Amino acid sequence: GSAYPAWGPEPWKADYTPWRRQVPAFLCPSDSQPIQDWANGRSPIAKTNYGFSNGDSIQGSQNARNNRGMFAHSSCYGISDCTDGSSNTILMGELVRTQGGLTMLGNTAIIAGTDTDPTLCRAALDPNNKNAFVAGTEIRGWSGDRWCDSNSSMTGFNTVLPPNSPRCSNDTWDGRWGIYSAQ
């Protein structure tokens, strides 16, 4: 067998059995999307419907120096670290996993410039269907895709836009900063 470091390898390593093990508590009971679907190109890594707050910033949302949420890369916080009276109200949120197609639900639109202008994310919605992106929009189904991945695109959200707003990234790399709304 393969040797792995303590706490496991990178979260995209599908040959690591614990990453493929679905934890039922990580899925909302109403989520009927397939868990592992090799035929449709979905990752064999287990999924989640729950995400963690990375604060209210687009740029550097995963960088502990810039993060204003409770969860940041290589950082540990406790409830006692919340001192402004309201910071512990947004700790976790629900994530819709990709529904496929151009639907806004669970999909992240790749829109150049969204790292500095969040209005571009909303502008990518179809004016005739506010629950879908306009035809031709490049889409990634990252939301909730790998429960073991700390990237905001997979298991996090920020409060740049209100809940149930679109999710957008400036780049096709799933580790890029972006507007990752809870949905």
Give a label for each model feature.
Residues 1-183:
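Internal low-complexity, small-residue/proline-rich segments
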